[in-house]
Amino acid sequence: NAMTAAGITSMRGAAEALQDVAEELSQRRQEVIGLNSSGITVASPAGVMSYYLPEGTDDTIENVRACNTGVVSTAQHEAEELRQASIQGTSANGRTVDQILTDIDVHRDNPIYAAAFINTLGGAQPYLALLSDIDRNNTGRPATTESAASTLGHILGAASQPEVNGSRLGADFSNIVTDMHSVEEVAVFNALTTQPDVVYGTDFLVSAADALEELDPAKIIPGDTIYLTSQYSHDPLAGVLYAMGSNPAAALAYLGGGGQVDAHGDWEPDEKTLQRWKRLKSRGWNYDEQDPTSKKPTAAEGFTAALAAASSYRNPNDPSDKNAARADAAATYASGMGVDYFSSNSWSRRQFTETMQKNLSVVIDDACCDLRSADIHSDTQCHALAPCENDRCLRC
C-alpha cells in the first residue's frame, strides 16, 4: 500500500522525537564523562554510573547540567579562594572569609560540589588545615570560625554520601587524625562532624569510628590553644558518635556490629563486635578537655546519642520481616550492652549530663524490659540511669 501523507508526517515526527531523546541521552552521558574527568564518580547502589539531582528536581538536561558539571568549576574556584583568605585574611579578589562562606553556602549540600571542593583542596589533611587556618587567623572572631565549621561540616556531610563514593573519606580523615594524634586535628574533625543539622554518610561514619576507636584518647598530643581546641572535644570518637545520633543506620551498624540471629531470636555478635564493645567499655570517657563554658557535645554524650539512635530499631512494626527482625535483635544487643555499661560502677550519677540522661531515657524506653543480652532484669538499674516514663519498666 502506498504511504499516505499523514503516515509520512507521523513517521517523520516519530523519528524526530527519537532523535531528541537520543540527543538528551547523549548530553546526560557527557555530564557523567565530565564528572569523571573532574575526579568525581556518581554511581547508583547497583554501581551504575549516573549523575546527581536533588530530590524533587525535574530531570531536565538544564537541571542536570546545573547540578553536576555546572557546580564543579564553582567549587574549584571557591575552594581556592577560601584557602587564600584563610591565610591572608582576604582572597586575591579582596573578599573576606565570611563573604566567601556566604557564596559557598548556596551549594554546600550538593554532593558533586562538595566532592569537587574537597578534591580541589587536596583531600583530608588540607581540608582539616583549612578550618585550622581560619580559626588561627581569626582570633577573637569566634562567629567566623563557627560559621566556617558549619559550612565545611555541611560540605563534608554532602561529600560523605554513597553516591559520590563518600565512604572512602571516613578512612581518609580518620587516618590523618590517627597518624597526627594531636589535639588540633582531633578537635577540628570533631567540629566538622558535630554539626547538628547534617546527616553524614553511613559508611563514612562507621569506617571513621572503626579506625578512631583504636586511638587512645589519653595519648593525644597537646597543642596550641585555638578556639576550636577550647570548645570541641579532644576525644577522637566524640564527633562520629554524635553524628551517629542523626544516622540510626550508622549507629546500628557500629554498635550492633556484625553477627547473626540465633534460634531464640537473640543477636550473636561476631568477634569484631565483641572486641569493639570491650574497647568501648574499657576506655576512658573523660578526655574532652573543653572549656567549662563550652556547650559542644562530649564523647559520652555522643556515645549515648548513638545508643539512642540504634535503639530506634527495637520493636519493629512487622516482626515477620526478616530484615526488621535482624535489626531488632542487633539493636536489643546494643541497647543491652549500653545500659549494662552505663549502669555499672564505671559511672557515678554526677557524671551524667542532662543530654546523656535524655539519650539514655530513649534507650531505656525502647528496651529496658528486654535486655537479656546484658542480663538486666531489674527496673532499679533502668532508673539508676535516667527517669523512664514507660510503665512497662514496672513489669521488668
Predicted region positions:
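Active-site cradle of extracellular carbohydrate-active enzymes
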Residues: 196-224, 228-230, 237-301
